[in-house]
Amino acid sequence: MSTYIQVNIYNQTLEVLKMRGLDLQSILKTIGCPDSWVTEVPIHPPAQKIQKPATPPTSCAPQLVSSPKCLESISAQSQNVLKKPFKSISAELGFAQPLNLVDTLGLKPRDSDAMSRGKRPASVLKGLFDDWDPTANLDIPGTSSDIPSDPSSALKVPKKEVLDESEEILDQTSGSSSFSLNDSEQANEQERNIIEDLLRQQMFTESKIKNEEASLLKGLKKGLGEELESSHANYVITCNFPGCGLKYNWRVKYGKLRLLDHALTHSNRKIPCKLCGFECTNVRRMRSHYAKAHPNERVEGYGMKALVSGDSSRIGDGVDGDIDQQVSDDELKELWNNCFSESIHLVGQASGFVEGEKYRRMTKRRKLDREAMNSMNFMF
């Protein structure tokens, strides 16, 4: 069973609604009503009632007639004159009379029958019109049967416009195409909304990750900053060896090599050159000798590990073999404590040298590697 829904919008026109940006056809298609019919029907005001003067009634006195032709003329006159019903009939009709076949068949009545029939109608019709008010206006509002002056304008009935077959097919085609166009636009809009939501979520996630990374890096930088600040801090180290009193501007990143090199100057050991007979008391002087006497040669075999563990060769060209340039563990600890006893809390103990640990200068690359390792240890 097919049904339809009718919606009436009063006091508006389609043109006014379109000027306001409301297209009823598109709205209905958007909410899922592709088959719709929108039209504009005028509503005419109701016809005004025209008052006409009442027709004065024609006086008609009841007469006794016996001829059928007279009875027919009386009934015709009563139909033409009496346009309004009786207000009330209070007269009693008395008893019912049988059918008079004589009058109906047009037979000649007898004198006795005519006399009796003349007496009865008089008694029956007596008082029939006593309560009738011919001037009474019994019209009910809205039920007037007066014919207006222009019946064609008053009897207009709105009807659906009948379209030709070609126009109907064209209308259906345009409606289906517009409907499919609206569907594609809605689908594209939904896709755009989904893509925008995904982009917003991705941006929110990226910003959250960036904030977490920034806070983590801030904490790492704070910890590393304190460590770097302590490593870059400048300390004045004074040698406490009797009769020395030399002061060094020392930093943690310089390492202990320079301090050990100074402590070796207070021993009886000589460091020989491997290329000639030159001897000196520390590594710095040996490096200076290489720069002047052997500029094309690399300085090798004079590191911390070689001086402590005895890995370097003992005899050089022109060097007496009885001279021992190595430093024993006990002697190294004694020299270290005699020189830096008041700065042990900064420079630490000499145990690292004795155990053969290789202390190197903190270069930029090593510093970055160390920071990376510290950050990894902090994260895990």
Curated annotation (Swiss-Prot):
Positions annotated as zinc finger (C2H2-type): 271-294
Gene Ontology, cellular component aspect: nucleus
Highest taxon of the lineage: Eukaryota
Disulphide bridges, residue numbers: none
Region feature Disordered, mapped onto this chain: 137-187
Localization per Swiss-Prot or TrEMBL: Nucleus
GO molecular function term, any single one: DNA binding
Keyword field: DNA-binding, Metal-binding, Nucleus, Zinc, Zinc-finger
Biased composition annotated in UniProt, kind: Polar residues: 142-152, 171-187
Protein name per its UniProtKB record: Putative zinc finger protein C02F5.12
